[in-house]
Design a protein with these regions (language model features):
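Short, surface-exposed coil-to-beta transition loops
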Residues: 13, 58-62, 85-92
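Charge-dense, helix-prone N-terminal extensions
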Residues: 5, 9, 20, 50-51, ...
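Hydrophobic pocket/interface hotspot
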Residues: 25-26, 35, 64, 75, ...
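Glycine-rich portal/gate segments that line the openings of hydrophobic small-molecule binding cavities
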Residues: 36-81
């Protein structure tokens, strides 16, 4: 009996300082219109808390599994049949503020099939640079 193809997953985490308030940043992290400006080719609401992230004309469905206004959002990716799966890939954006310096930090947690850490770092640096252009920070 053949075992299912199980891919190793990694939890990649990185933080970036951003010169914008959480109130300005959050819609870019948690809404289809905001995400489509910097994160992927397009994002569309499908139903309720489900979204379709489109990269290179390929659909990737996800569900908002948690959200705290102006603070954090988590997207859990669904299978090809738009169903939840155990050990699903997820993406989490969290905004933190330093009480001492008054700086705002974007923490990204990308849990997905194993990738080269340097490649992921470079990818997220490019994406966050696009986000900074959008918010002026």
């Amino acid at each position: 009996m053949a075992l299912p193809d199980i891919q190793a997953k990694t939890r990649f985490m990185v933080e970036f300082p951003i010169n914008a308030s959480p109130k300005i940043l959050f819609p870019y992290l948690a809404t289809a219109s905001g995400l489509s400006q910097w994160f992927c080719d397009d994002v569309r609401y499908v139903e309720g808390q489900r979204l379709n992230f489109i990269w290179d004309q390929e659909n990737h469905y996800a569900e908002i599994s948690g959200q705290r206004l102006n603070r954090a959002v988590r997207f859990v990716f669904l299978d090809d049949h738009r169903q939840t799966v155990a050990d699903a890939n997820f993406l989490e954006f969290t905004l933190d503020s330093s009480q001492v310096t008054d700086e705002v930090y974007l923490r990204v947690v990308d849990y997905s099939s194993a990738h080269d850490a340097d490649e992921q770092q470079e990818m997220w640096e490019g994406l966050v640079a696009k986000l900074r252009e959008q918010v002026g920070g």
